[in-house]
Design a protein with these regions (language model features):
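Acyl-donor (CoA/ACP) binding surface of acyl/acetyltransferases
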Residues: 1-35, 54, 67, 71-185
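A short gly/proline-enriched turn/hairpin at secondary-structure junctions
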Residues: 35-43
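Active-site rim helix/loop that mediates acceptor-substrate recognition in acyltransferases
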Residues: 42-63
Length: 185
């Protein structure tokens, strides 16, 4: 990939995350409801948001991850991020991750964004497998993945530390051939 790929849906723009997004990222990453299943603590300072943006930018430049900002077309408001991490060009796989501001939950934005990046991952990035690691207690995230065709593969015990407590996760996966044949697209 050369320049950052900007994608669109009917309601959303998926775009690069810029330094100017730090305040908005801080707003929702400082909210415990957003981070309680994220495997990290809620932000306490704006610098943490700036560091995360820098991590996304460096990760993209080094082909280790790609993270899009999720922006509402109607208002140009950044409401979340989504993307792929644990990228392996050699093995043609990645893991998907996403979060949406609590102010925009239950509106279908996560599903809309993930569907779009899955298409991009399988078609443009030529992935053959996309996984998702989800805390066992994170039912909302599992409800996003299931309708898109992700299959639960099994539990990974004590895989993530959340609030200094080892937590179990469920590994999900979606294969390219399943995506191509599915009605989820």
């Amino acid at each position: 990939m050369t320049s950052f790929p900007h994608l669109e849906t009917d309601r959303l723009k998926l775009r690069s995350i810029e330094n100017s997004d730090a305040v908005k990222l801080f707003e929702y990453f400082s909210n415990r409801e957003v981070t309680k299943y994220y495997g990290m603590d809620s932000f306490k300072t704006l610098e943490e948001a700036e560091t995360l943006i820098h991590t996304f930018q460096i990760g993209y430049q080094s082909n280790k991850l790609i993270r899009w900002g999720i922006e509402l077309k109607e208002t140009n408001e950044l409401i979340g991020t989504c993307g792929f991490h644990a990228l392996s060009q050699k093995y043609k796989r990645a893991e998907v991750g996403y979060e949406i501001s609590h102010l925009h939950w239950k509106k279908g934005y996560a599903t809309e964004a993930i569907k779009t990046i899955l298409d991009f991952g399988f078609e443009e990035m030529e992935m053959i497998r996309i996984g998702a690691v989800v805390l066992l207690a994170n039912s909302p995230s599992r409800r996003v993945l299931a309708p898109l065709g992700f299959k639960e593969e099994g539990m990974l015990r004590n895989y993530i530390i959340q609030d200094n407590i080892p937590c179990d996760v469920i590994m999900h996966s979606l294969l390219k051939e399943e995506w191509i044949k599915s009605s989820y697209r």
